Amino acid sequence: MLKDFREARIKEIDELRNLGINPYPYSYNKTHTTEDIKKQFEHLSNGEVTDKRVSTAGRIMSIREHGKSAFFHIKDTYGRIQAYIRKDKTENYEFFKERVTVGDIVGVEGIVFKSNTGEITILVEKFELLVKPLRPMPEKWHGIKDKEVLYRQRYVDMIANDETIKRFRMRSDIIRMIREFLTKKGFFEVETPILQYLTGGASARPFITHLNALDIDMYLRIATELHLKRFIVGGFDKVYEIGKIFRNEGISYKHHPEFTSIELYQAYADYEDMMNLTEELITYLVEQLYGTTKITYQGQEIDFTRPWRRVKMRDFIKENLGVDIIEDSDETMAKVLAENGVEVDINDRGHMIEKLWDLVEDKVIQPTFLLEHPVEISPLAKKHREDPRVTERFELIIYGREMANAFSELNDPVDQLERFMNQLRLRDLGDQEAQMLDKDFVRALEYGMPPTGGLGIGIDRLVMLLTDSANIRDVIAFPLVRPEGDIDIEDYTDLEKSEIIEKEGGNKA
């Protein structure tokens, strides 16, 4: 039984203490990562031994015993490396043989050689046990099949699957590269409130909380837009924020109620400038990660070679559904939606337009800028300079998904107030996603906001694309899952369902 495993491990740890060995030492002097060692010594010939000494640490993932010696693999953030331990070379070989198993976290020190089969290996001279886990590791070949367990116990997923660590390293690299790119462009990274008195900047249902100190209800932000624009009013030319956004909506393979976005705003720019910036940024990321402008996502080649396709929302919907979202009546649009199995409120033209787009969005595979959204669904965007029925707005669509959203930002306070009032009318009609009236934002605009281009990109969806991940929860380290209830620290039922092996001996192979 797995409960017996835990009890045996606790007993073993007590025995270590009785031997004067601290089973949880305070630190370890690690000179190299596994990646450092492999890069530094990749030039060695097969069988070549150096006199260079290294020390590294990590979790033992496998052990192969050979009489009075053993090979084992250590895993850290950067990968795995082989270590070789021999009775005649290692000070505490007997301790290793008797006490160390797969899953233990250890530190090793020794010289480096390349095995006869060409694998960089550490010949261990000194060895230290750093942690002995109380729980067994996932079985090597079967691992965890239950996705809910993977998401809930991501730490186990990371231990078992090297690809998981690689994916989250890439996420970190992508965010770092975005920051580096924008810094070189002269953008300042700023911070805006997560707790807000009003929500704005997007059409979404917010999470509500209560601030005891002031005895008022507050909201978790659904966007950073309105506060970032206040920076532009105040005199910043270029600002951005990378942070968490919260929307009390559904969960799907491409939606998550808590997600990460970047919004940026540039004074004296418009949506054409934002299109160019978006192309440049994402192409830069693709080239930095893959050395090319073409990647494969879910078996489909995606080509980021510039310039990207540009198409008007009106034209694309008319081409695919035969309805004109600018000229046709509400009744005509409602009829087309009904023919496609979508029932809507005929009094909400903006909602009908969004539903029509939903029907055709997945037809767009290659990077495409969808342009000129109607005013009804773009309350914060400037009206188009040549056609006031639409706005200077674009969405970037890749593989049937919105990746970015951008405007020539509305900076006319009278027009902005009028659009806010229209949003209030929609709220009165029951649309809980319509935007609230932010009077302070209107007041800020009355002080004067220069012509401004704004851009928002969903970081999680971007990481999905760049890591070939099918589900948004695969790129969020600790996504939302159903609560599992009270956890009995000695209960392994959740792990038994996930095919965790029952015997320690099965690991030592």
From Swiss-Prot:
Mg(2+) 2 binds at residue 402. Its EC number is 6.1.1.6. Its cofactor is Mg(2+). Keywords: Aminoacyl-tRNA synthetase, ATP-binding, Cytoplasm, Ligase, Magnesium, Metal-binding, Nucleotide-binding, Protein biosynthesis. One of its GO terms (cellular component) is cytosol. SUPFAM superfamilies: Class II aaRS and biotin synthetases (SSF55681), Nucleic acid-binding proteins (SSF50249). GO terms for biological process: lysyl-tRNA aminoacylation. PROSITE patterns: AA_TRNA_LIGASE_II (PS50862). Binds 3 Mg(2+) ions per subunit. GO terms for molecular function: ATP binding; lysine-tRNA ligase activity; magnesium ion binding; tRNA binding. It is found in: Cytoplasm. It holds the Pfam family tRNA_anti-codon. The keyword Nucleotide-binding applies. It catalyses: tRNA(Lys) + L-lysine + ATP = L-lysyl-tRNA(Lys) + AMP + diphosphate. The keyword DNA repair does not apply. It comes from the Bacteria. Mg(2+) 1 binds at residues 395, 402. Belongs to the class-II aminoacyl-tRNA synthetase family. Homodimer. This is Lysine--tRNA ligase. It comes from Fervidobacterium nodosum (strain ATCC 35602 / DSM 5306 / Rt17-B1).
